[in-house]
Regions:
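Glycine-rich, acidic/polar active-site loops that bind/position phosphate-bearing ligands
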Residues: 1-376
Length: 376
């Protein structure tokens, strides 16, 4: 509203990484500051820090992980650009989930990704082929929330750089083709106090009250904070029945049709949020989860019994927003978001999303040309 001013960038020396896939290159993540030294509230890292400070006042730490999927194509980025991103060839001709042959064909470049990330201080646990053609997932070890978010953004750059160096291209677009599964970013979270997972009652050997309230907050508030899980026009095309992405709010111990899947036990007991796509900004998505969960704890929100069945076909369950416009309106009306994230933050991201929706509304798509060229 006041034009484009300058900001200061303060390097976080704890975030320094030597990028082994780039010759003689180091990377440091910075925090945005105003000239008076105060944080830029709207900056994604500031948004997450604010929620982590709330946890810190209770001596609680959030441990998180993000599972990013991406599509690998045989064309380079320049070739994909010249082709208008049409008729691209995925690195596999069929779905490769739990298949051995096709992931093996991609192993030289996937191995390079694993090795270079680990050598650069981003420790990789594993990689596997996924449900769509040319789709892969490379999982990084969990860590405290801010470290995981930093790793996340560097990870995406690494995957694209290494694909480019190998004569290919990689895309994190949430939904590349309607007949294929989308690229997700499942987020795992647990809370620890004095080194113990407070989502688990170690005496009773079952989920704790803290877990139940945190999950209750996620179920109640995630729809109105969905913009932070799905920030693009394309993201909402991922929310389709039978697509491995959720469409409704529910939780279960092991059910991939729901929004929240509960996994592990004891110290590893955690919540998996299946809403975010690979376009999610990790700082904002992590902050939204923590804000929702803390509201659940503070309000002592109860969570319902674990859902059993196919959530895709159960119309009694609350639905996720179906478009960027709907998610933007929900965020704009969210009292929780304005209270705990801040009105400036909400106004900024609502404004940004509305500009994106406006840009798309004026675009003429291939679908329109095919549907209307001759028929009307």
């Amino acid at each position: 509203e006041r034009g484009f001013g300058d900001f200061e960038m303060r390097p976080d020396t704890k975030s320094v990484k030597i990028l082994t896939w780039q010759s003689g290159t180091a990377l440091v993540v910075c925090d945005y500051l105003h000239h008076d030294g105060s944080p830029v509230e709207e900056a994604p890292r500031s948004v997450l820090r604010k929620q982590l400070d709330r946890l810190g006042k209770q001596k609680i730490k959030a441990f998180m992980a993000s599972e990013l999927e991406f599509l690998l194509f045989d064309q380079t980025y320049s070739e994909a650009f010249d082709a208008g991103y049409q008729n691209l060839r995925p690195s596999s001709d069929y779905r490769i989930d739990y298949h051995i042959l096709q992931p093996g064909r991609d192993e030289s470049i996937i191995r390079t990704m694993r090795n270079e990330l680990t050598a650069s201080g981003i420790p990789v646990e594993c990689s596997k082929g996924e449900w769509s053609r040319g789709q892969h997932e490379v999982n990084v070890e969990y860590a405290e929330a801010l470290e995981t978010a930093d790793r996340h953004v560097i990870f995406k750059q690494a995957i694209k750089d290494i694909a480019h160096n190998g004569g290919k291209s990689a895309s994190f677009i949430p939904k590349f083709a309607e007949e294929e599964a989308g690229n997700s970013c499942h987020i795992h979270i647990s809370l620890q106090k004095n080194g113990k997972n407070i989502f688990w009652d170690f005496q009773k050997k079952k989920p704790s009250k803290t877990f139940q309230h945190f999950l209750g907050g996620l179920l109640k508030y995630s729809p109105e904070l969905c913009l932070f899980y799905a920030p693009s026009i394309n993201a909402y095309k991922r929310y389709q029945s039978g697509s491995w992405a959720p469409t409704r709010m529910a939780w279960s111990m092991d059910n991939r049709t729901v929004g929240f899947r509960i996994v592990g036990h004891g110290q590893s007991f955690r919540i998996e949020n299946r809403m975010p796509g690979a376009d999610a900004n990790p700082y904002l998505a992590f902050a939204a989860m923590i804000a929702s969960g803390l509201a659940g704890i503070e309000e002592k929100i109860s969570c319902p019994e674990a859902y059993e069945g196919n959530a895709y076909s159960d119309e009694s369950l609350p639905a996720l927003p179906s478009s960027l416009e709907q998610a933007t309106d929900l965020l704009n009306k969210s009292t929780l978001a304005k209270t705990v994230l801040g009105s400036k933050v909400v106004d900024f991201y609502v404004h940004t999303a509305r500009l994106e929706a406006k840009a798309f509304a004026s675009a003429v798509t291939d679908w329109e040309r095919k549907r209307y060229f001759e028929r009307i």
